Amino acid sequence: VVVGDFDSLEGRPPRTDVRTIALPALKDDPDMLSALKVGWSAGCREFHVYGGLGGRIDHTISGIQLMALLARHGASGYLYGDGLIVTAITDGRLSFPAHPVPEDGRMVSAFSHSDVSLGVNEPGLKYELKDGTLTNTVVQGVSNEFRDGVDAAISVEHGTLIVTFPIEVALPQVSRFHEFGGDIGELDTAVSKLLVR
């Protein structure tokens, strides 16, 4: 499925042999959220967004917020770009298998997306935070490091963390501490009602 408003497309429109959902350019939901909603309605609960980092900073921040939205509904999302992966976890754990770590591929960071994240643990990392509290106004989780050949994890008992790690690292196993409900909303194909005409 190809989803978008195609407002920045140069050249020919998308292939006609692929299901295409064309959205109005003057809408409320960004294209990425619309694409996630289409996937969600088809039963997807793990999303990989390539090219979701870099370019416009507002799009990058939007993508990070969407990873948090997915995590808060019990799904997983990964933004890929410039040698980095960004994901989010809510009330759960990301377990990274032991791996050889090149000197330039050690950095892993965790930031609180929620106002407060409680019970944050980072076993196996260079700085092993235990039962910590992170907030979204104080930076405490930046530039931690994987250790060569050591299993590692990042977990949060209550709250949402944004986690960044090198693209060379295998995706973590995700476990959640409880069931999540709800959905991320229905696809909105209408022109924004907030538009000033």
Where are these regions (language model features)?
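Acidic/Gly/His-enriched mid-domain segments of enzyme catalytic cores or analogous surface patches
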Residues: 1-73
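Short coil/turn connectors at secondary-structure junctions
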Residues: 17-18, 43-45, 73-76, 105, ...
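Short beta-strand segments
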Residues: 50-52, 80-81, 111
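Short, acidic/small-residue loops that bind anionic groups at enzyme active sites
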Residues: 69-86
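Long, charged alpha-helical interface segments
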Residues: 89-197
